[in-house]
Amino acid sequence: MAVQKNRKTRSKRGMRRSHDALGTATMSVDSTSGETHVRHHVTADGYYKGKKVLSL
């Protein structure tokens, strides 16, 4: 099992974690229903790119 020789400082730990944050999801407005949804995902009422793809 790997064990570190020297303890990592708070600074080095923070530098490593600096890339772990999640960005906000980009939202789009559907052209047909005007509903806000996550990009590249079907809306709640079944529309994608202005076309009905799911019958709910």
UniProtKB/Swiss-Prot annotation:
GO MF terms, alphabetically ordered: structural constituent of ribosome
UniProt keyword terms in alphabetical order: Ribonucleoprotein, Ribosomal protein
Compositional bias (Polar residues): 25-35
InterPro entries attached to this UniProt entry: Ribosomal_bL32, Ribosomal_bL32_bact, Ribosomal_zn-bd
Disordered: annotated span: 1-37
Ribonucleoprotein among keywords: yes
GO CC field: large ribosomal subunit
Any single GO BP term: translation
Basic residues biased stretches: 1-16
Ribonucleoprotein keyword on record: yes
Protein family per UniProt: Belongs to the bacterial ribosomal protein bL32 family.
Name used for this protein in its record: Large ribosomal subunit protein bL32
Organism field: Pseudoalteromonas atlantica (strain T6c / ATCC BAA-1087)
Phylogenetic classification of the source organism: Bacteria, Pseudomonadati, Pseudomonadota, Gammaproteobacteria, Alteromonadales
